[in-house]
């Protein structure tokens, strides 16, 4: 939700994505302690020194991720301060600058709120990695005990091959090997399950954060269009600014787009698209024309440009959260690029 001073709402309502996927509890790493860089190094060194060998690498990764989250908290505080300062600076400027900086400050403050929510989602990923680390730590003693028994049996066979202790130790070794097999199987299964779960938390959080940042950037660009940057001569007065209602509506549209955003599952296709093969065959045929010094057929140039324009138009039409004015501007730019390509086609045909 936007900053309450500008949001037209008195209470924080859950967004559509939060209703679909309830937010996680607050991150366990939040604190206001000083000496952050020193504590970062101490955490990593402690994990590398006192953690069992099997879990050492993952333990260091978990501590590094905690350092990342602490750094994100610092970034959030700085972004909030910058958003307030931007609005404070524009207060004494002209009407258009004052209004736009005020509204951009709202959007930038919302970016800090999104990053604050990202920390909580990121902590889910880190805590799931910790569960893998705990399993690895529990398997390490079993491995060490098995290896210790093997060393003792080897030493005893060389010292006293007829010792009655060998039978007892070998029976104990069989039990330890069976326990190791169970522990290794559990480790393998848990690692795969928890790793996929952890990365799902991580990638889903990054996907939502990136999509919402894209929405904020889109509406922020539209706010900039309200500023008239036409040069004026000395003594000439600028037209009166009348974009207050428009800027207010843009912020409301951005708020609605952010609150109504829901995740969509991207389709992953591991089969090589046929269109790439067609493009490669077209490229080879163009190279053949160039090698033989012959002009490229106009039909082939037109076909390729039509495909590119069609794909670009489809991407723009399906892009979520795009403001209508921004959509019209991009479509007009595509149309102008297509019209500029006509003289190039004629030149190819004449050649």
Curated annotation (Swiss-Prot):
List the Pfam families: Pil1
Asked if Signal is a keyword of the record, the answer is: no
Q: What keywords sit in the KW lines?
A: Phosphoprotein
> Which residue intervals make up region (Disordered)?
1-33, 318-351
According to its UniProt entry, the protein's GO biological process terms are: eisosome assembly; endocytosis; endoplasmic reticulum-plasma membrane tethering
Q: Does the keyword Phosphoprotein apply?
A: yes
Sample GO molecular function, one term:
lipid binding
* GO CC terms, sorted: ascus membrane; eisosome; eisosome filament; plasma membrane
| The record's account of how the chain is modified after translation | Phosphorylated by ksg1 and ppk21. Phosphorylation is regulated by sphingolipid long chain bases (LCBs).
Q: Which residues are reported to carry the modification Phosphothreonine?
A: 15, 230, 233
- Residues bearing Phosphoserine are 11, 17, 39, 163
Residue ranges annotated as compositionally biased, kind Polar residues, are 8-20, 335-351
Please give the superkingdom of this protein's source.
Eukaryota
Compositionally skewed regions (Basic and acidic residues) per UniProt? 320-332
Q: What does this protein do?
A: Negative regulator of cell wall integrity (CWI) in unstressed cells, probably by inhibiting protein kinase ksg1/ppk21 activity and regulating their downstream CWI pathways pck2-MAP kinase pathway and protein kinase gad8 pathway. Activity may be regulated by the transient increase of sphingolipid long chain bases (LCBs) during heat stress.
PANTHER family, sorted: SPHINGOLIPID LONG CHAIN BASE-RESPONSIVE PROTEIN PIL1 (PTHR31962:SF1)
Q: What is this protein called?
A: Probable sphingolipid long chain base-responsive protein pil1
Please report the organism this UniProt entry assigns to the protein: Schizosaccharomyces pombe (strain 972 / ATCC 24843) (Fission yeast)
